[in-house]
C-alpha cells in the first residue's frame, strides 16, 4: 500500500482579517478563477513511510509553479514577508497518518525560516491544541522553535462575524454554546488567531 501526498496548489494563502468587521456570505469573498497545481510522486511514500527528500522536491516544484519564481526562497517571499505572522493551518484531528503529514509541514516551515521569516512569527495551528499534540506537531514546533496554537484555546472574536445562509446547531467551543440548552445560529465567529495575530495563512490538508 502507498500513501500519496498530493499538494493542491501546494498551499492556500489568504490575508487574515482585521477586527471590527462583519462578513456576509457573498461571491465577492471567493476567487472565481482559482488556480490548482497538483504535484504527484508515486515514490514519495511507500507503506506509510515518507521520503522526506521527495516531499521537499514536491513542495518546491509546486511553489515554483504557483509563483513563477526562480528559486524557493524567492517563491516564499513573493507570498509572505518577514513582517508577517504566518499561520500554517493543519488538519491534526484525524491523527498522524490520516491527517496532515508532519513531513509536509516540516518542509514548509524550513522554507519559511530559510526565507527569513522569524520562528516566533510562524504558528502551526488547528482547532484544538490537544489534537496538535496527539499528532506530534509539538515535536516539529520544538525542533524549529515555532509556535503551536489552537483556535478554541485562543478564543473567538465576537466583533468579527460571518452570517451563514444555513442555520446550524451550536456545539462545544462555539460562542453562545450552552450544554443544557440546544441553540441554533447563523453566525460564525472567527478565531482571535486570525483576527488579531496571523496575517498570512498557509493551509496544508
What is the role of each PLM region?
Residues 3-7, 14-205:
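N-terminal and secondary-structure boundary signal
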Amino acid at each position: 500500500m502507498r500513501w500519496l501526498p498530493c499538494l493542491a496548489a501546494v498551499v492556500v494563502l489568504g490575508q487574515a482579517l482585521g477586527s471590527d468587521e462583519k462578513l456576509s456570505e457573498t461571491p465577492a469573498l471567493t476567487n472565481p478563477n482559482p488556480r490548482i497545481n497538483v504535484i504527484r510522486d508515486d515514490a514519495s511514500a511507500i507503506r506509510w513511510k515518507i521520503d522526506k527528500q521527495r516531499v521537499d522536491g514536491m513542495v518546491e516544484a509546486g511553489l515554483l509553479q504557483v509563483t513563477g519564481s526562480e528559486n524557493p526562497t524567492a517563491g516564499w517571499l513573493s507570498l509572505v514577508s518577514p513582517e508577517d505572522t504566518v499561520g500554517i493551518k493543519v488538519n491534526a484531528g484525524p491523527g498522524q497518518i490520516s491527517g496532515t503529514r508532519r513531513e509536509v509541514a516540516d518542509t514548509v516551515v524550513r522554507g519559511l525560516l530559510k526565507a527569513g521569516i522569524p520562528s516566533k512569527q510562524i504558528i502551526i495551528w488547528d482547532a484544538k491544541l490537544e489534537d496538535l499534540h496527539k499528532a506530534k506537531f509539538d515535536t516539529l514546533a520544538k525542533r524549529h522553535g515555532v509556535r503551536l496554537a489552537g483556535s478554541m484555546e485562543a478564543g473567538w472574536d465576537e466583533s468579527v462575524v460571518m452570517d451563514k445562509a444555513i442555520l446550524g446547531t451550536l456545539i462545544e467551543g462555539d460562542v453562545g454554546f450552552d450544554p443544557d440548552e440546544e441553540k441554533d445560529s447563523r453566525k460564525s465567529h472567527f478565531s482571535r488567531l486570525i483576527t488579531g495575530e496571523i496575517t498570512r495563512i498557509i493551509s496544508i490538508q
